[in-house]
Amino acid sequence: MTTAQFICLSLGSNLGNRFEIFRKAFALLKELEIEDLQSSIILETKALLLPGSPKEWDLPFFNSVLIGKTTLSPKQLLSGVKQIERRLGRDVNALPWSPRVLDIDILLYGDENHQQEDVKIPHERITERPFLLSLIASLCPTRIFHKPGSEYHLKSFGEIAHLLPCPQEMILNSFSPNTLLMGVVNVTDNSISDEGLYLEASKAVAHAEKLFAQGASVIDFGGQATNPKVQQLLNVEQEWSRLEPVLKLLAEKWAGRRQYPDISLDTFYPEIIKRALEIYPIRWINDVSGGSKEMAEIARDANLLLVINHSCSLPPRPDKTLAFTTCASDQLLSWGEKQIEAFVALGLRQDQIIFDPGIGFGTTQIQALNVLHKMKKFRKLGCATLVGHSRKSCFSLLGKYDAKDRDWETVSLSVLLQQQGVNYLRVHDVEANQRVLSAAAWSGVHV
């Protein structure tokens, strides 16, 4: 029986939606006979370029380090990671040092040295990348570096990272690898926390740019407020009059971008999605009504992700809530199982469905906080999970604060949700949540 060997890999990307590329790479690596896969945080760094490189190559890189165990030989592992690179869109004919969708390097393989033409382990530039040394040390600080002839031979990675510190100016940002953020852009005049700020298309798109720069993997545009204070919902034409200018401006300004987030529309009208797809390649439907048959069919045919958000009424009403005699999370789990079964029967793939428990859409404040503490339960659904807890009224149980002043409670719960394996968090303050999540994930997370 072959003994599983410790391995250490690095991932890099500076094209496309880098968060989603990493997420897909994690999944494919687990299929490649790699067990107990753990990721460091993601560090965004300046591109390392040769003098005279084209200006358009100067795109920031996402970098992470992964550790795990495998029975694959070094050559088998190399072959496998190269297949993953190609599968996720890497151009094998691209020039060296040019931007790339995904770069996977084998940094370490057990304590062995492999210095063959096609496999060089430890990686020959490992000590020239201080940000990688820092990430390796975050995962396995006492692991010994084996490379005879190197001045760092037989030193621990904790010590090497101390001797070769990463210059502060090299690191642009740090991000959580396993819990991604959906930034909120309310194109409305009656949202509770930011009413009227982004009604103009130019302001909505500028805010989306800001959220993306702060680390949002997805930007969720909504033209309809669905909070408890709403008296009358907008019809299709009213909602579309708000979203159409935003989508047209996105198509104008973001066409040809080499780094970008996914775009989501927060709507329960299938007609809105049909019209939007003619203007901009949105990737997500965020349906607070829970998803209709028609919406599921659109997602299926256009290969979109569909967020199914549980709700008891729209807008939420205090007399329409989950039952009080049964555990709230159990009720939501049962609803999720039925919805997913129905949508899969329509031909929607399970990996296209994202479950949202609908915090505030039929949960009382106490039920909402209880559900947030039991999100691990929804792993049973076999699909990704998303939570929209940002600035919700349930935090009023903790103190009397205006909605816009509930970010302390939001980020605290974000860490708890990260620890429970929630895949996406829908938040207003992307920067605060991202900084807290990356700090909480410093010593690594399972992916």
UniProtKB/Swiss-Prot annotation:
One Gene Ontology biological process: tetrahydrofolate biosynthetic process
Chain positions recorded as (7,8-dihydropterin-6-yl)methyl diphosphate binding sites: 226, 266, 286, 356, 392, 426-428
EC numbers: 2.7.6.3, 2.5.1.15
Domain of life: Bacteria
Binding site for Mg(2+): 186
Gene name per UniProt: folKP
GO cellular component: cytosol
Species, as recorded: Chlamydia caviae (strain ATCC VR-813 / DSM 19441 / 03DC25 / GPIC)
Name of the protein described by the UniProt record: Folate synthesis bifunctional protein
Pathway recorded for this protein: Cofactor biosynthesis; tetrahydrofolate biosynthesis; 2-amino-4-hydroxy-6-hydroxymethyl-7,8-dihydropteridine diphosphate from 7,8-dihydroneopterin triphosphate: step 4/4; Cofactor biosynthesis; tetrahydrofolate biosynthesis; 7,8-dihydrofolate from 2-amino-4-hydroxy-6-hydroxymethyl-7,8-dihydropteridine diphosphate and 4-aminobenzoate: step 1/2
Lineage summary: Bacteria, Pseudomonadati, Chlamydiota, Chlamydiia, Chlamydiales
UniProt-listed Pfam families: HPPK, Pterin_bind
